Amino acid sequence: MKTFNYFTYGSNMDKNDLDRWCQKKGYDEIKFLDVKVAVLESFKLCFNYFSISRNCGTSNIMEFKDSNVYGLLIKLSEKDKIKIREKEGYPNYYFETLINVKTFEGNLIKGVLTYKVIKEKEKKDHQQPSKYYISLIINNAEEYEFPTEYIRYLRSLETK
């Protein structure tokens, strides 16, 4: 089976939310073949995109020195890529990019697929995520034991 590595830093970390989306679309659930906590260095998690479908700000990553984004490095089968692309809003809202991440064990993993908001859709100011949306991220950050200061940052974000 062909597989690929996917780094998710937003709501797609939440398997239940992802499963609900698949069910709503009539798709089989996306199977997480392997999951590791990973960090994307020199990037910052921000909310500068407004999602019409969620009616709130949603996550994006921006290059930012001395900052890190924590998320999940997930191994997926190639057949699930089409579902991830649709869920991510590719190519109209988010684009695919290959990044390098480090696992908590210190291993550098190169050529990992992630998604970033397309320039035309990025806003200049903070788009407030809903309490529900940010809870998806916080709950998984706690479950996977992200650093305390990162969870504190997530909790400090202004929501609607």
Task: Report residues per predicted region.
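Glycine-aromatic micro-motifs
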Residues: 1-160
